[in-house]
């Protein structure tokens, strides 16, 4: 995305992100999924360029995620797995040889409702995201940042219910 200086001036004046601002700047959430750079030019020639840190913007755009339960939650014997990845293009759960697509909510949380048979299985999240340093979309295979259990080598998360004694 390219933006002009008028857009930047008005956007930088905003100190909080509320619904009115989201309506006024509807493309900001999409812009954050790709490369963002600020370039200074003189006489049409670029003289400086830098990337942009977006962490604070994400917190402002997705305040509802603060109250979400992330990681594994249980509804009886059924697990629900949730991951906050607001800039991801796609997220899936690697469960053995299966790759299961997660659904993105408006607050940037990706969710997958599981099955009772998943208890005790190892998993990884596959997160497709644009990486500025390599200028392309890459798939990161990661353990769950909210893991309550890991495999012995710590290479995968485990779907575990710590309230069930036989899981220990």
Stretches with model-predicted labels:
Residues 91-93, 123:
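Short beta-strand elements bearing conserved aromatic residues within extracellular beta-rich modules
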Residues 84-90, 118:
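Short proline/glycine-enriched turn/loop motifs at strand-loop junctions of beta-rich domains
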Residues 96:
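Extended, well-structured beta-strand/loop surface patches
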Residues 2-76, 80, 99, 105-168:
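The feature marks proteins involved in alpha-glucan
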């Amino acid at each position: 995305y390219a933006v002009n200086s008028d857009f930047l001036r008005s956007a930088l004046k905003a100190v909080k992100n509320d619904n009115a601002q989201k309506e006024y700047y509807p493309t900001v959430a999409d812009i954050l999924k790709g490369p963002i750079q600020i370039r200074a030019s003189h006489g049409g020639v670029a003289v400086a360029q830098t990337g942009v840190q977006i962490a604070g913007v994400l917190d402002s755009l997705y305040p509802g995620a603060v109250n979400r339960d992330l990681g594994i939650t249980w509804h009886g014997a059924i697990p629900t797995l949730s991951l906050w990845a607001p800039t991801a293009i796609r997220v899936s759960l690697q469960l053995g040889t299966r790759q299961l697509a997660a659904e993105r909510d408006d607050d940037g949380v990706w969710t997958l409702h599981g099955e009772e048979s998943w208890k005790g299985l190892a998993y990884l999240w596959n997160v497709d995201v644009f990486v500025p340093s390599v200028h392309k979309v890459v798939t990161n295979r990661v353990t769950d940042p909210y893991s309550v259990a890991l495999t012995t080598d710590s290479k995968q998360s485990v779907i575990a219910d710590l309230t069930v004694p036989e899981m220990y």
